[in-house]
């Protein structure tokens, strides 16, 4: 089973659903059939499955898990969209259909611990699934990376390519304000020995990238300036070599904003997992 080979997803215009992440990872069904119980379920998410840019984040995180010796699995074709965009858009019926389907599968496998690279999936699995009978320990990948680093399972090379470079970090709304996870991503970046330059609006006062609350899937509203352009400008103002994100949607919005300003040569947007994967021994 390949990462991203999901049964159901959000389909964006022009999206090729047949382009998968070519990386072999065990599914829950395969592991249970062989009498194994994984330590953690990696919830890939729609973006991480079908968006070509986000697939790189998925591969990077899976590579880290493999190198760190984590016993994990994915759902594969059994993973459907969490229903987050449906609920944010006001389609409660659709959300509950999707959520109950996922919960039935998760509970059927007696899942206890879930890790995901998507703050949207993280937030809804952690905070909204319990009301429907889905009770799990849900952690974001930056939290898991911090744990693995502290446990010595992730070792960073002294000569990693990020060392001495400057970076600014964008706080995802669902990770930051919604769940108050500010330090884990920054602690992980500290391990790379980079210079962290905070944007003028950060942490609890951070500005949305423009994709939150299902805004990524609707037409823009009239205004003087696109939200992602405003945020990209704040990132560019820090004169950092890199912009780190911890959300596939934020990554897309910031990348588009920086390209629009013709700054992609000077400032590259990367997920924290991509940076750690390259820096590992």
Language-model features and meaning:
Residues 50-57, 148-149, 173-191:
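Active-site glycine- and acidic-residue-rich loops that bind
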Residues 222-241:
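A short, acidic, amphipathic alpha-helical segment used as a generic capping/interface helix at domain edges
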Residues 139-144, 150, 163-178, 195:
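Catalytic cores of enzyme domains
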Residues 92-94, 126-127, 180-181, 185, ...:
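Iron-sulfur (Fe-S) cluster-binding segments and ferredoxin-like electron-carrier domains
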Residues 132-161, 201-204, 262-281:
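Short, flexible loop segments at boundaries between secondary-structure elements
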Residues 44-49, 77-90, 115-124, 170-178, ...:
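Local cysteine-cluster metal-coordination motifs and their immediate loop/turn environment
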Residues 59-71, 182-195:
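Short helix-loop-beta junction
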Residues 1-79, 83-117, 122-129, 148:
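Iron-sulfur-cluster electron-transfer modules
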